[in-house]
A protein has these predicted regions:
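An alpha-helical interface "stripe"
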Residues: 1-215
Length: 215
């Protein structure tokens, strides 16, 4: 019998708890080839970390009075890769959009110009949101890694298609600091786009857990 709790056992226990106690849907995105697009995320490019179908489905439900074309416009703004921005600046910009909504303009059926905001997350009634726990998602580098490098975080928690929580797990006999030094630090370097929407980073080996921001 193993004298430690394996990373995989921790991951599976976490996913089961999220699903059965907290009401998350669970999606295993692992593919044998990192570049394979058929992973259930509906991304057209593995550099993207936002799930477009989840986001649009949520936005249509949360914004019934806004034309679909304007919702598409808002989603395009959210999904902009912000390659020229630092992760901190991109995170600040997306935080504002998630908190306040994405401003749009349109003419209503009477021809009157409307100024509204596309709501991305329902903060008053969390049950209106789409909760998804994603495991083993391949993400292609846009950072300073070698060309076509891929990274695969253990678990990412999505709300309405937005990756808000990053979770890195280790065997219980591995120092938790290794999750920071070996994984989180390299993700900052290789796939900084993962942290543009990030609200929390969680590092755990089941015996010890740390929660903080990506900075």
């Amino acid at each position: 019998m193993a004298s430690f709790i394996s990373e995989d056992n921790i991951e599976q226990a976490l996913l089961q708890r999220l699903q059965h106690i907290h009401g998350f849907n669970v999606l295993d995105c692992y593919t044998a080839k990192p570049e394979e697009l058929n992973d259930g995320s509906h991304r057209a490019d593995k550099r993207d970390v936002i799930f477009p179908v989840e986001l649009k489905t949520a936005c249509l439900a949360l914004n019934p009075d806004i034309p679909e074309s304007k919702i598409d416009e808002a989603i395009e703004r959210v999904m902009n890769r912000r390659a020229a921005m630092s992760p901190i600046a991109a995170n600040r910009e997306l935080y504002d959009l998630i908190r306040d909504g994405v401003p749009v303009q349109f003419d209503d059926e009477r021809g009157i110009k409307q100024h509204q905001k596309v709501r991305l997350v329902h903060f008053d009634d969390p049950k209106q949101n789409r909760w998804l726990a994603v495991s083993q998602l391949w993400i292609k580098s846009v950072g300073q890694a070698p060309k076509a490098a891929y990274r695969r975080p253990d678990v990412i928690l999505y709300v309405n298609g937005l990756p808000l929580v990053f979770i890195e797990l280790k065997n219980s006999n591995v120092r938790l600091r290794n999750a920071f030094e070996d994984n989180l630090r390299s993700y900052h370097h290789d796939i900084p786009q993962l942290f543009h929407c990030n609200a929390f980073c969680v590092l755990s080996n089941a015996l010890e857990t740390r929660v903080g921001s990506f900075t």
